[in-house]
Amino acid sequence: MHHDHLISTIKKRRETLNINQEALAELANIGLRTLKQIESGRGNPTINTLQKLADVLGMELKLEVIKK
């Protein structure tokens, strides 16, 4: 599932950069609880929240809409 891959990518990048959840939440200006929910797969992040995380982690968020 794409959602699982996205969450896994964010978490792995955070860990690669040796940033703990508290620091990432603060740097991205999102709640720690929100970040924990996202990383555990229980959250439903907005595109804005994902963009904030991507910016802090030095990643690019790319949204692609395709016809099935």
Name each model feature, range by range.
Residues 29-43:
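Recognition helix of helix-turn-helix/homeodomain-like DNA-binding domains
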